[in-house]
UniProtKB/Swiss-Prot annotation:
Membrane topology of the entry: Peripheral membrane protein
Protein family (similarity comment): Belongs to the ABC transporter superfamily. Arabinose importer (TC 3.A.1.2.2) family.
Organism listed in the record: Burkholderia pseudomallei (strain 1710b)
Keywords of the record: ATP-binding, Cell inner membrane, Cell membrane, Membrane, Nucleotide-binding, Repeat, Sugar transport, Translocase, Transport
GO terms for MF: ABC-type L-arabinose transporter activity; ATP binding; ATP hydrolysis activity
Assembly: The complex is composed of two ATP-binding proteins (AraG), two transmembrane proteins (AraH) and a solute-binding protein (AraF).
UniProt keyword Amino-acid biosynthesis, yes or no: no
Annotated protein name in UniProt: Arabinose import ATP-binding protein AraG
Any one annotated GO CC term: plasma membrane
E.C. number(s) listed in UniProt: 7.5.2.12
Pfam families, sorted: ABC_tran (PF00005)
Entry's localization field: Cell inner membrane
Domain ABC transporter: 5-240, 253-497
Source taxon at top rank: Bacteria
Length: 503
């Protein structure tokens, strides 16, 4: 019996880069096949070929034994294939129902029957166990909720082959469990699934088989993961042993650099108070909706502050805009790097030099292009940013390499005092995480106060000197590194009445 999906010797070349070279593996009906590899290894490129966005330069894609050519996304969908990419694809000013049924809204005599559409979507969402308002506009939803809409859109197409690229990167624990149930149901229903994730727990929980990519090549395939240690997968992905991914080392801390007292904003009603010392890394943990990102955006001047006070090195701090924050040496690496972190149409060099261009002026009039080129080349080499050259458009880089470029932007800033990192390793592979943690520690050694928001509890525990836990828009507690463990943190993060054991 033919495999539901087969990749046969797939190759793809971009200018200066061989993105895929000889990729061959099968996905059976009723199987979840994991794909793992560092950012830039070629996983997402393969899915774009499957989804009709790219055409392979060699090899073929077979669906149910038939060689297929997908000149467009519509052709892929018509063949029973659904691909959910990391970069969410939605219309922000349309409702959940309209996004889910885009192109197939029920109509009568040319008029859309919105009531029928909303009822249909509500019924299907309820059947999937997904709690979303069918009438809510996408722009008003959180990133996690938008991700669920994308997943539901693929499921509504009743596709036989479904590919998921980092589907849980923005989901809460509850939403992740809903997704896992959906994947299990689809497997039992005989669908063939490809599942890309950097999270080992998810690969071992969901996947029947797994293929490892490195530098565009297929370096290993496992028909079963039952007897494959995690260390083996990591070594195959990165080509080396990583004994301590966090490489934490105690540091001498300075005086209090950033202090917040009874800080309030539109989504922060209780008043948040905390300190961060020079050279200290303070991790902020909480469930989705706890208010962590909102607090950081208030500090950075991206959201309105309605109460409380901030001080920087003991001096009152009045930040009314992000420009004020940057001028005072406070920067933010945002959660949504695609929308807020990078300038997608600009080059890698331009993205690295954006913040420090005021230091690169010559005679007050002209940009020092030579100095900018040298700065970009230095950080591309230092942070191992995978790019053909500094002139490459940053949108063509993997998520991990985009994040490195954002961090390089602030490493190049000479007057940096406070660095706020909101989900700095979301959707990034284990090798790139290791390198980014090194950058974070380098910033701390320079005396920067580091505030790191993360939904990955092992990351918070592994990197932070101190952990602040938020719950329902307020600070629920604080733990020193020596007293912090998963149970203690979760007991502070969970709603009152729940416990870590119950979770």
């Amino acid at each position: 019996m033919a495999a539901a999906l087969r990749f046969d010797n797939i190759g793809k070349v971009f200018p200066g880069v061989r993105a895929l070279d000889g990729i061959s593996f099968d996905v059976q009906a009723g199987q979840v096949h994991g794909l793992m590899g560092e950012n830039g290894a070629g996983k997402s490129t393969l899915l774009k070929i499957l989804g009709g966005e790219y055409q392979p330069d060699s090899g073929s894609v077979l669906v149910d034994g038939r060689a297929m050519r997908f000149p467009s996304a519509a052709a892929s969908i018509a063949a029973g294939v659904a691909v959910i990419h990391q970069e969410l694809q939605y219309v922000p000013d349309l409702t959940v129902a309209e996004n889910l049924l885009l192109g197939r809204l029920p109509s009568a005599l040319g008029w859309v029957r919105k009531r029928d559409a909303q009822r249909f979507v509500r019924e299907r969402l309820a059947a999937m166990g997904v709690d979303l308002d069918a009438q809510a506009k996408l722009r008003r939803l959180s990133i996690a909720q938008r991700q669920m809409v994308e997943i539901c859109k693929a499921l509504l197409r009743n596709a036989r082959v479904i590919a998921l690229d980092e589907p849980t990167s923005s989901l809460s624990h509850r939403e992740t469990e809903v997704l896992f149930k959906l994947v299990d149901d689809l497997r039992r229903d005989g669908r063939a699934l490809i599942y890309i994730s950097h999270r080992m727990d998810e690969i071992y929980r969901l996947c029947d088989a797994c293929t490892i990519f490195r530098d565009g090549r297929q370096v290993a395939s496992h028909a079963s993961l039952a007897n494959v240690p995690r260390e083996t997968l990591v070594r195959q992905m990165v080509g080396r042993e990583i004994s301590d991914i966090y490489h934490y080392a105690p540091r001498a801390l300075g005086d209090v650099r950033l202090s917040a007292r009874a800080l309030e904003g539109d989504a922060l009603r209780a008043g948040a108070s905390f300190d961060v010392r020079a050279g200290e890394i303070v991790g902020f943990f909480g469930l989705v909706g706890a208010g962590r990102s909102e607090l950081m955006r208030v500090i950075y001047g991206a959201q309105r502050r309605t109460g409380g006070a901030l001080t920087l090195d003991g001096e009152p701090l009045d930040i009314r805009s992000t420009r004020d924050a940057i001028r005072r040496g406070i920067v933010l690496c945002p959660e949504d790097r695609k929308e807020e972190g990078i300038v997608a149409h600009a080059s890698v060099a331009e993205n690295i030099n954006i913040s420090c261009r005021r230091h690169g002026l010559r005679a007050g009039l002209f940009l020092d292009r030579k100095r900018e080129a040298e700065t970009a080349d230095r950080f591309i080499k230092l942070l191992k940013i995978k790019t053909p050259n500094r002139r490459q458009k940053i949108r063509f880089l993997s998520g991990g390499n985009q994040q490195k470029a954002i961090l390089a932007r602030w490493l190049a800033e000479p007057d940096l005092k406070v660095v706020i990192l909101d989900e700095p390793t979301r959707g990034i592979d284990v090798g790139a995480k290791h390198e980014i943690y090194g950058v974070i520690y380098e910033l701390a050694k320079r005396g920067c106060a580091i505030v790191m928001v993360s939904s990955e509890l092992p990351e918070v525990l592994g990197v932070s000197d101190r952990i602040v836990v938020m719950r329902e828009g307020r600070i629920a507690g604080e733990l020193a590194r020596g007293e912090a463990n998963e149970e203690a943190v979760l007991n502070l993060a969970l709603p009152q009445g729940a416990t870590a054991h119950a979770a």
